[in-house]
Swiss-Prot record:
Name of the coding gene: katG
PROSITE patterns: PEROXIDASE_2, PEROXIDASE_4
Transition state stabilizer, annotated site positions: R95
Pfam families assigned to the protein according to its UniProt record, in alphabetical order: peroxidase
Superkingdom classification of source: Bacteria
Assembly mode: Homodimer or homotetramer.
Taxonomic path: Bacteria, Pseudomonadati, Pseudomonadota, Gammaproteobacteria, Moraxellales
Cofactor requirements of the protein: heme b
EC numbers, comma separated: 1.11.1.21
One GO cellular component term noted in the UniProt record for this chain: cytosol
Single Gene Ontology BP annotation: cellular response to hydrogen peroxide
Keyword entries, A-Z: Heme, Hydrogen peroxide, Iron, Metal-binding, Oxidoreductase, Peroxidase
Sample GO molecular function, one term: catalase activity
Protein name as it appears in the record: Catalase-peroxidase
Amino acid sequence: MSNESKCPFSGHNSKPQVTVGGGTANLHWWPNQLRVDLLNQHSERSNPLGKDFNYRQEFKKLDYYALKADIKNVLTDSQDWWPADWGNYTGLFIRLAWHAAGTYRMGDGRGGAGRGQQRFAPLNSWPDNASLDKARRLLWPVKQKYGQKISWADLFILAGNIALESSGFRTFGFGAGREDVWEPDNDVNWGDEKEWLAHRNSEALAGSNLAATEMGLIYVNPEGPQASGDPRSAAPFIRATFGNMAMDDEEIVALIAGGHTLGKTHGAAPADHVQADPEGAPIEQMGFGWANSYGTGVGKDAITSGLEVIWSQTPTQWSNYFFENLFKYEWVQERSPAGAIQWVAADAEAIIPDPFDPSIKRKPTMLTTDLTLRFDPEFEKISRRFLNDPQAFANAFARAWFKLTHRDMGPKARYLGPEVPAEDLIWQDPLPAASATPSSASIADAKAKIVALGLSAGELVSLAWASASTFRGGDKRGGANGAHIALSPQREWEVNKKAVETLTQIEELKASTQLSLADLIVLAGNVGVEQAAQAAGFNITVPFAPGRVDALQSQTDVESFQLLLGLADGFRNWKKQGVNTPAEVLLIDKAQQLTLTAPELTALIGGLRVLGTNWDGSQHGVFTQQVGVLSTDFFTNLLDMSNVWAPVDSTSEVFEGKDRKSGTVKFTATRNDLVFGSNSILRALAEVYAQADGKEKFVQDFVAAWTKVMNLDRFDLA
């Protein structure tokens, strides 16, 4: 058999193998290519459960306390393939839950535990998640037993809670409701570094959406910045990373100390004994990674972080030993068996139990970042208070742990299960209880009063969009429910200036209707859409679901809500001054946060432009002579080859469209507008609506996408 005739998949042919999805990708040739593909993540094509599956309904069939009992049994059912420290997986499951939730960042609301992402790359193979593949596999028999009645995302967090409870700790509660997805969240920017554990400075962290000091870590390097072994210099990095998760100093101290009250780290030998992570491991390892050639590779020979630290005399039982040991002893720097920097209590007796040999005792050990809680002045004050008041520490940790593990779930209305705390917490963006649903007659009366105001379709639509478009699909915050546009800080946002002028008139109607202001705002937008569609020759009724309520200023964390402003809203042609990111990139970001598909994005932009909804009243992208008519003019004029476009200055932010022959300026546009003609994917979508038979479809698609945005935060309708 000649070389030329050998099978190309046999491994014996020197010719390049042709594989599906292989070869040089578009992003190689055009690394700045617009990521329109991010709008098509998590489609029905990747979901094996189908579009009719309802997790909330399935969860209600669950025997919740039987599930808890089964998870508790797993804790002490040590497996030979991954033996439990002290015969108990408590520390491992706490770390599993912590690291599932700890990727959340409040800046853009992405990351976190809400979608079970730790099952997928890159998180399943982050250096900081080493050995959590074993924790997930330990839970598989439980997941297999209960099936779709419990998601992996909920199971990870619940396992952490049960681990704490089994140690004698009283948790604050648990809310289920995290729905699994079936592929990685490719929209999350984990950083630009191309090497694991590449370091970032604290100033850059504080001004970014990144939640870790190094690529592949959950928070900070436990050896200190760049493994310096300096507890004091670690403080600003700790504050920056935990601060990006909305944690204050007390919560930081409570979380670090509470998380390190139980369990241990693993560093039996140098890292050169450790093989590939799960994504890079050989197929026969069946999704496991970090195979360890040192000794048995498990148990006393385990290598995870490379650190070998046990903080407490009772590492499977809740105690105050972390703080007692932290302040009782003088700490001397040492190296773990793996060569990592850690600290040992030089003046202590050997009082720490060995995890596998009860005849062996060790001296207390700490991480560099643990000592930060003693040597940073502000952290030290809190730590001493917790030292002297163990109950205050336990209460603070219980609340901080609940916040850590639920911060990305959105409003409490999404929580499921019998252990949801009754208390409303400010970070949950609480809302008043809903009153009686308004009748059809009262809705019709309110619509008539809105029409009587004589406001334009664009004014009505602009207000509703400003109210609803703050929604973030990552952490389920924002949206029209609550009418937060009437409160600080949203009422003062520059981008809402014209919308608030309309809001003032809608507010005056509230007393004479049976609707909440939040409902009135959305209804006003619907009226505007209906008027614009009628002007285009289509009589439609935009779906309206009443039941929204009005938040109080006292229920609104101004600093937290300020983050919902974001960097841009390309739907209104607004971009924050000083932001250098191209507008079209931020438009995709905004659309992805609104959970829009590429076709929905296209329909909404085309409709909003012809209605004249730019934040400042400018004519950029308003490619029509019939402003207020829900026409396809945006698309037909954008794709009209009689127009030629050029930037008005060197920034290439604003463009003029001139008649190709006469040179007369016909339109102006931003990058948000022209991208629907320049990007090949978005142009293909724009062409659908620019075609002769696209008018009715456009109106239908716009109304559907509009209604979706108006209801994004209506979790009560699910």
